[in-house]
């Protein structure tokens, strides 16, 4: 494996179990005696009632009834053809209207392309007109649920790929003032559907129990686990050290950026920060390299839609030196191209372990060596100093906040309405799922690298450790490039047209909520 790695890049490569204590997860964690890590691990469990071990779901002989009242939970291995299998199954169920719900459009665009016209995107394809046609199947972000009525979901099939991300989005502040409406319509869609299909490579019992609570006890439930572990990657976790002193530099990524730019052959990069993606793009472009970058600023353009519809074909046609993917393309994106990239890199300094794990697997080719630079904790951490030893603490916080809000009201009618809202929340499955998901995310962000390594090892990947030296010149170039990008953004905002008061008020409401 070492012969395939970039030369003059790594000063040390050793198996993970031989890491010294500066790098290795502490003994009490790795031996399973750490209570917090045990709690975290238990929250990630998935309990199937059907277990298979097949390289591809399409060849598994999996024979499921797919009848009204059924709910299916699939935890497939990465690269086992779950989308192809799902589309084949949906074609057999032509008598039902179908809704594919997602968190972000990028995954939905790729799904639509694979269905060969069986689905349309609500925002892109005049959904407000087509929704009157019962034969039209929709793919939509959960944000767009507000454009539907509860009755629209009667007797339909609801498909939720990457269901864990969708559930997290339900409690996200980004839904703003629409949050309660989105949650209500999501609940109605799950309750009213004839069949519900949920899929996720990181699916947990928490999500399963939540959907069951919404669906009711009179339904049939099937939880399917594919134990096959394809695409075992050779992964090197990179740790930056000072060139002169040998001191470990915990959050220094200059050496990784320098190594990425030193390649003469194509490389694939994922990064959890859009700003890092754009910075790397500019630095590579200034050296004459051709770059494909997918992030929130580029995904709406037509080129990126072509990329999403068939990534391998687009890469073969455009022949980029670098492909850079941000979290916008980190979930569900399937890039099966083989023998094109010589290395894959991941720069993980934001988000939680689940999100980082998903991004690493976007490039399917197992022959490509992977290099991960991951900070010990996420740069975006909620440092509220509250006691969050377990998800129960977050639940207590939520209840206390609701109680405080109630006490601040003066009108008796308002108090009664809010009291009823509190009771409804505490009686709902949201009161359990929301604090659990929040606690898991917070824990992973505070122990990002350790959690990610444990997840990669559990998935069967070959994990090693490598040191890489820092580079002061590259660090300075990164700093200057980011400053230029920020200055351009500020100038663009300054020169933009004034926002109407109505839009500004709506934006403030969204941010506040």
Label the model's feature ranges:
Residues 1-70, 91-92:
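Replication-associated primase and helicase/ATPase modules
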Residues 74-80, 105, 181-211, 348, ...:
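Conserved helicase ATPase motor motifs in RecA-like P-loop NTPase domains
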Residues 96-108, 203-207, 250-284:
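Conserved strand-helix element at the start of the C-terminal RecA-like helicase core
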Residues 115-152, 306-309:
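Inter-Walker segment of RecA-like/P-loop motor cores
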Residues 151-198:
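SF2 helicase catalytic motif II
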Residues 296, 367-513:
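Long, low-complexity intrinsically disordered regions enriched in Ser/Thr/Pro/Gly
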